[in-house]
């Protein structure tokens, strides 16, 4: 019986992280290579079955390309700044921050990432509103007038003082601002669209009101009408899932996250 040898093409990993993020781009290129991809920095117009694209955030031209590739069945991974500090990069399929898929394994990753919680706070004075920066994909970005509208809506449910903390990325230079920890001091609750400030609020034991349809910790947040009686749910499982979206540079270089994405 004659057998014909078939040479399958090597899958391509397209690294579209901008050159300005040289450390992150180099790590992702290495990780794609060590997980079995031929690495390219070109912008593809079509993907083969096992190809993958890694892009930094999903908005503007990246969103247009991601929409096109996914409509063809392509595999798109979104990278962005980590949610637990500068030592990590966040990775998720299709969308970031709870809007996409992460390679969650039912294993404890919290200890490795040294995530610790303070007990839930049972007192507090003010409501802290933390808007997002205002850009992103159609699915995830905060509505333009959200901050003004949410402050007005909060007045229907509480008489507490309401403070608005603008996103640090929108701060003007030479202005003095309190740290997030200082703004959270004596806070009763933190209100977000889907800002990362909510992650740190929950770690500090301060309940979160989330107004977006998608957020990485949506399962343990409350709706606005519960501002005076916010949920104080167990945080372990939600944060353990979040931890599987956070990868160190060394882990990314090893290729582990891309292998996990390729298996599902």
Model-predicted segments: where are they?
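N-terminal pre-catalytic "stem/leader" segment of glycosyltransferase-like enzymes
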Residues: 1-52, 135-136, 259-264
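Short loop/turn segments at strand-loop or loop-helix junctions that form parts
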Residues: 5-14, 79-83, 125-136, 165-168, ...
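Short acidic, S/G/P-rich loop/turn micro-motifs used as interaction or catalytic elements
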Residues: 16-21, 59-62, 134-138, 169-170, ...
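Extended catalytic core of nucleotide-activated donor transferases of GT-like folds
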Residues: 25-27, 33-89
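Donor nucleotide-activated moiety binding/catalytic core segment of transferases
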Residues: 40-47, 61, 65, 155, ...
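Structural motif
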Residues: 51-52, 126, 188-189
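Leloir-type glycosyltransferase catalytic cores
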Residues: 88-125, 140-141, 218-264
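Conserved catalytic-core segment of nucleotide-activated headgroup transferases in glycan assembly
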Residues: 122-171
């Amino acid at each position: 019986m004659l057998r014909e040898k078939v040479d399958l093409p090597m899958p391509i990993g397209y690294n579209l992280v901008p050159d300005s993020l040289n450390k992150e781009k180099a790590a992702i290129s290495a990780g794609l290579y060590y997980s079995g991809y031929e690495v390219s920095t070109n912008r593809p117009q079509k993907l083969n079955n096992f190809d993958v694209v890694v892009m930094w955030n999903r908005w503007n031209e990246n969103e247009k390309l991601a929409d096109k590739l996914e409509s063809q069945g392509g595999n798109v991974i979104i990278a962005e700044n980590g949610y637990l500090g500068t030592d990590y990069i966040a990775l998720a399929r299709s969308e970031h921050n709870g809007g996409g898929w992460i390679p969650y394994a039912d294993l404890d990753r919290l200890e490795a990432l040294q995530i610790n919680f303070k007990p839930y706070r049972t007192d507090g004075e003010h409501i802290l509103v933390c808007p997002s920066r205002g850009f992103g994909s159609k699915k995830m970005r905060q509505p333009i007038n959200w901050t003004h509208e949410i402050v007005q809506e909060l007045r229907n449910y509480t008489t507490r003082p309401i403070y608005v903390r603008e996103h640090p990325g929108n701060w003007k230079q030479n202005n003095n601002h309190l740290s997030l920890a200082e703004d959270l001091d004596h806070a009763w609750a933190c209100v977000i669209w889907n800002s990362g400030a909510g992650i740190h609020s929950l770690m500090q034991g301060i309940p979160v009101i989330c107004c977006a349809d998608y957020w990485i910790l949506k399962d343990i947040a409350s709706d606005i009408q519960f501002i005076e009686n916010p949920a104080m749910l167990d945080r372990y499982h939600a944060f353990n899932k979040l931890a599987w979206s956070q990868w160190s540079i060394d882990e990314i270089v090893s290729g582990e996250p891309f292998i996990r994405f390729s298996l599902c």
